[in-house]
């Protein structure tokens, strides 16, 4: 992994050793059916380091697993940092891999956002700063185990996040004035169907269970927005900014939901009901609205 590209920033379980099924802790909740302490393998992890219930995770009470994405950190830690070693080799190796995974994953998340920002039309000085941050972040993520374990990730993130926010603001302003600023807003369960969210800032907004049916999100910055259970049926995200696949996987949508480039329609999304004329029908909407 010598260059950062889309493939390096997407989870590839075939090149990993199931780190995300062992390293994190999770508690029994709507996202996970059981309690699991950090460092203990999930009981569903098979000897071949694949999930034994992968195709049934949602129905078996593990939707949290379906929306987790390591941004390619798992295979980098496995194949590059540890040269293909396995956490089962010995306890010191296991602990080191788990510790370093928690460092490399946020770095890879930054790499994904930086890469995404560099696809936008931005002023040359900002593009140069983003490219420099991308290279610096990749160098850090490619460090040896000792340097990674001592790395101050939060300090590095604090230097990068303002650049990403600036990129989002510049992109939102293209084609007109920026929209409403709701960054960090608590919008849990909110009915936003009649709110103009074009070119809005929804960075870090809590949109859990929000009703966004048929909402136009063109130019909206969704960096880090929590879309768990949000209703995106018929919404247009084709021109939204910084939408990660895991956000879509956590939401509800249908075939009428417009997706950004290079994103896949989650398999659990429902097909829209059809009116007699063949057009999509949306619950809660009267004809012509």
Task: State each model region's role.
Residues 1-152, 156-159, 163-173:
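Hydrophobic scaffolds flanking metal-cofactor catalytic centers in soluble metalloenzymes
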Residues 165, 173-289:
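Tandem repeat scaffolds
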